[in-house]
From Swiss-Prot:
<feature type="compositionally biased region" description="Basic and acidic residues">
    <location>
        <begin position="12"/>
        <end position="24"/>
    </location>
</feature>
<dbReference type="InterPro" id="IPR001107">
    <property type="entry name" value="Band_7"/>
</dbReference>
<keyword id="KW-1133">Transmembrane helix</keyword>
<dbReference type="GO" id="GO:0016020">
    <property type="term" value="C:membrane"/>
</dbReference>
<dbReference type="InterPro" id="IPR010201">
    <property type="entry name" value="HflK"/>
</dbReference>
<feature type="transmembrane region" description="Helical">
    <location>
        <begin position="71"/>
        <end position="91"/>
    </location>
</feature>
<dbReference type="InterPro" id="IPR050710">
    <property type="entry name" value="Band7/mec-2_domain"/>
</dbReference>
<comment type="function">
    <text>HflC and HflK could encode or regulate a protease.</text>
</comment>
<comment type="subunit">
    <text>HflC and HflK may interact to form a multimeric complex.</text>
</comment>
<keyword id="KW-0472">Membrane</keyword>
<dbReference type="InterPro" id="IPR036013">
    <property type="entry name" value="Band_7/SPFH_dom_sf"/>
</dbReference>
<feature type="region of interest" description="Disordered">
    <location>
        <begin position="1"/>
        <end position="24"/>
    </location>
</feature>
<keyword id="KW-0812">Transmembrane</keyword>
<comment type="similarity">
    <text>Belongs to the band 7/mec-2 family. HflK subfamily.</text>
</comment>
<dbReference type="Pfam" id="PF01145">
    <property type="entry name" value="Band_7"/>
</dbReference>
<protein>
    <recommendedName>
        <fullName>Protein HflK</fullName>
    </recommendedName>
</protein>
């Protein structure tokens, strides 16, 4: 069965001959940016067809009517040519053309030569490479409740012409209000100190830029903030004078603290050095005391078996050793009965008086003969040592003897007056 068709729809064989069908195919092959050129060709084609159909009417009447008709035709033709020629426009390299059709956005025209139907489309060129500026100024209250005079310039650039024109009614005014809001928000959280130290322009520039971007983001304005510059940023004169004394006192305080810190570090380092020195001396004294004690113990252990075998001889020897230490540092001079200046130790007296008894006791006991020789030899050495010391005392004065005594390390003794 044949398919039912509408009365005004051409058949399949006649579709290729239908001019309106061809026109629809042409429209489908062009993109949105090339519609304006298609409108131009369609209008020219319609004008030519109109003149062909009306040719008989214009040229078949009488002379006066024919002249009038030709004049009207010429005017209409000239007007159409003028309208067609006026539709050409050129977009600069740094611009984009926002094309609207009866007030509605149609497309963006790229840089170059274009054509638009007059009275149907409108083109608004938008510069997207030039950096624009907005100035704002005012007196703003800080966090510490002080007023600050601010004069600031914000540089921005348009990145989306469509959003810039159609997102908000007045993008410049909206951006100005956003800048004021961001500036007041940052300054209201800042203390007066950073303004007095001229540090606000360095610290708050990035914060203000971020706040402006956050404010304008929901509006989709198609704007990017490039830079922020503070032309003037100062405190009122009355506020500045009131804070000069305060900041001078703060600087004096910091200087005093630094000096105190330096002095404290010096004292700590000196105390640390002294403590370390005392510890080293204490360790050396401890070691010396231990070694002396070990020497005494060793000496005692060496004498102990001799003392057990011969208590009397050992007692006399120990007594001699003790008296040697005592009288080797005495300043008393002992002479003989003739008052000759002959120095000798008290040990000599004891030895002369007891020499015979000692020899007899040693000869009676062969067991202790070797021990006696050892004791006698050591005793003789001690006698020679004492005599040499006494001779040194006689040759030098008391002060030199005190100096010599100060170098002795075996024991500590305080001299008598």
């Amino acid at each position: 069965m044949e398919k039912n068709m509408a009365w005004n729809e051409p058949s399949d064989s006649e579709k290729d001959k239908d001019p309106w069908n061809k026109k629809d195919k042409k429209l489908k092959n062009f993109d949105e940016n090339k519609k304006s050129k298609l409108y131009l060709f369609l209008e020219i084609e319609c004008l030519v067809n109109f003149l062909k159909r009306k040719k008989k009417i214009f040229f078949s009447e009488s002379g006066s009517f024919k002249y009038f008709k030709n004049l009207i035709t010429m005017i209409i033709f000239t007007t159409i040519i003028f309208l067609i020629g006026s539709g050409f426009y050129f977009i600069q390299e740094s611009e984009y053309g926002v094309v609207t059709c009866f007030g509605k956005f149609s497309y963006l025209a790229n840089p170059g030569l274009h054509w638009k139907p007059i009275l149907i489309q409108k083109v608004i060129p938008i510069d997207v490479s030039t950096v624009r500026e907005i100035n704002t100024s005012g007196t703003i209250l800080t966090y510490s409740e002080h007023f600050v005079q601010v004069n600031m310039t914000v540089q921005y650039r348009i990145v989306d012409p469509k959003k810039y024109l159609f997102s908000v009614t007045n993008p410049d005014n909206c951006l100005r209000q956003s800048i004021n809001s961001a500036l007041r928000s940052v300054i209201s959280r800042s203390n007066i100190d950073i303004f007095l130290k001229n540090e606000f322009s360095l610290l708050a520039k990035n914060d203000i830029k971020v706040n402006i971007q956050k404010i304008i983001k929901p509006y989709h304005m198609g704007i990017v903030i490039s830079d922020i510059n503070f032309r003037t940023l100062y405190l009122p004169q009355a506020v500045k004078l009131a804070f000069e004394d305060i900041f001078s006192a703060i600087e004096s305080k910091k200087q005093s603290l630094n000096e105190a810190r330096i002095y404290s570090n010096e004292i700590k380092s000196q105390a640390f050095y002294n403590a370390k020195k005392i510890l080293i001396e204490a360790k050396s004294d401890r070691l010396r005391t231990i070694l002396n004690a070990q020497g005494i113990i060793f000496k005692f252990l060496k004498i102990l078996p001799i003392y057990k075998s011969s208590k009397k001889i050992t007692t006399i020897q120990l007594y001699f050793d003790c008296m040697e230490k005592i009288f080797s540092h005495t300043r008393k001079v002992l002479t003989n009965s003739d008052n000759n200046f002959f120095l000798f130790s008290l040990n000599d007296l004891f030895l002369k008086n007891n020499y015979n008894s000692l020899t007899q006791s040693h000869s009676n006991s062969n067991k202790h003969s070797s021990m006696l020789n050892t004791v006698s030899s050591s005793h003789v050495k001690s006698i020679d040592h004492v005599n040499s010391n006494n001779l040194l005392i006689s040759s030098n004065n008391i002060i030199n003897q005190r100096k010599l005594n100060s170098f002795r390390k075996d024991y500590l003794r305080i001299g008598r007056e």
